[in-house]
Amino acid sequence: MLRLHWLALLVLLLPMAAAQLRPEPELDAQWDLWKRTIQKAVQRQGGRNVPEVDLGEEPEVHRCPQRGARLGKHSFQLAMNYLGDMTSEEVVRTMTGLRVPRSRPRPNGTLYVPDWSSRAPAAVDWRRKGYVTPVKDQGQCGSCWAFSSVGALEGQLKRRTGKLLSLSPQNLVYCVSNNNGCGGGYMTNAFEYVRLNRGIDSEDAYPYIGQDESCMYSPTGKAAKCRGYREIPEDNEKALKRAVARIGPVSVGIDASLPSFQFYSRGVYYDTGCNPENINHAVLAVGYGAQKGTKHWIIKNSWGTEWGNKGYVLLARNMKQTCGIANLASFPKM
């Protein structure tokens, strides 16, 4: 099974379109990175079930041709990373964790109503305004929902108090009874917990360990409160754009099940295989803009800085709901 996975990965990363010539030093660097990644995979496997990979030829990571080619050009790049020894199924099973409740009643007043009276800015990046804490790593715990929720809470805390502070995803993993800890959860359940609990601890007071244990919330470590939440109208990227522009970072859900997402490196991500109806991973929309004419969302992931572009991915915007970006979006009220 692992051997088949590696063969599929080689096919994905080897040339799939006309090759673009690169200087020898860059090829050497790519080859060295490939070998180091293979060695790291061997170490992580403990010498067991190591895939049989022929390293006799130098695999070059090329620009990824988009299925359907709707962008009209190759818009993003793939690269080997620390997830190289995992299948896409393993990544989804152990490193996502968005679980949408079967019944999602929407209490009165929780639907976000955008203000259409004025134009939204052409581009927004809340990182530059100091609303976004450093990229975190959820590890092999299905706690993406907690990191997404915490990121949105951190942005609203900055907006309300002027102070940026890392809040505790572990507080949510342990204590949100309507969710399932490392087994998965949903962002609005987390916001509602913080409201009813009258607070959430800081990361310093309640550090992340990525395991399920009993709730150890302490009011002495409380760093933020929440008075409710708002949900963005589904399948409405224009409404999501307004929310990100006027409110701050917004919790969103996407499909993160494809190998192209697993090995994303840079550029604007777009893959027609990304299914808007298969949302399995919670992330944080921290802005939007355009790169070389291609509109995108700025997405903060929780897979550490060694994934993607220092932990971030640019996701195609206004391309028929890329990966379901606007289907499960929400933010807390403070």
Curated annotation (Swiss-Prot):
Q: Which GO terms describe its molecular function?
A: cysteine-type endopeptidase activity
Which residues have a glycan attached per UniProt?
A: N108
Return the CDD domains for the record. Answer: Peptidase_C1A
> What EC number(s) does this enzyme carry?
3.4.22.38
| Keywords assigned | Disulfide bond, Glycoprotein, Hydrolase, Protease, Signal, Thiol protease, Zymogen
- GO BP terms in the entry: proteolysis involved in protein catabolic process
Propeptide residues according to the Swiss-Prot or TrEMBL record: 20-119
Induction statement: Up-regulated in response to V-Jun induced cell transformation.
Between which residues do disulfide bridges form? C141-C182, C175-C215, C274-C323
Query: One GO CC annotation, please?
Result: lysosome
Q: Where is the active site?
A: C144, H281, N301
Of which family is this protein a member? Belongs to the peptidase C1 family.
The protein's job, in short, is:
Closely involved in osteoclastic bone resorption and may participate partially in the disorder of bone remodeling. Displays potent endoprotease activity against fibrinogen at acid pH. May play an important role in extracellular matrix degradation.
Its protein name is Cathepsin K
What is the source species?
Gallus gallus (Chicken)
